[in-house]
Curated annotation (Swiss-Prot):
It comes from Lactobacillus johnsonii (strain CNCM I-12250 / La1 / NCC 533). SMART domains: RNA_pol_Rpb6. InterPro entries: DNA-dir_RNA_pol_omega, Pol_omega/Rpo6/RPB6, RPB6/omega-like_sf. This is DNA-directed RNA polymerase subunit omega. One of its GO terms (biological process) is DNA-templated transcription. Keywords: DNA-directed RNA polymerase, Nucleotidyltransferase, Transcription, Transferase. Its EC number is 2.7.7.6. It comes from the Bacteria. Pfam families: RNA_pol_Rpb6 (PF01192).
Length: 72
């Protein structure tokens, strides 16, 4: 999959690594699919992952460094 919008450079300016970006986008996309409120009024993408990436690029979704999840 090739990301054309938002640009990967803009996305990586919001997070510290590609891994963090992929995890954040996947988690936010899952929330969107589960019915969470959207953070933007308008989206260019019609898919949850694209919407999540647009929210990250806009600075509406960030990583909470204090949040820890149980692995198993």
């Amino acid at each position: 999959m090739k990301i054309t919008y938002p640009s990967i450079d803009k996305l990586l300016s919001r997070v510290n690594s590609r891994y963090s970006l992929s995890v954040l986008a996947a988690k936010r996309a899952h929330e969107i699919q589960a019915g969470a409120p959207l953070a933007l009024k308008h989206y260019k993408s019609d898919k949850a992952v694209g919407e999540a990436l647009e929210e990250i690029a806009a600075g509406k979704v960030t990583i909470d460094p204090e949040h820890r999840e149980d692995i198993g």
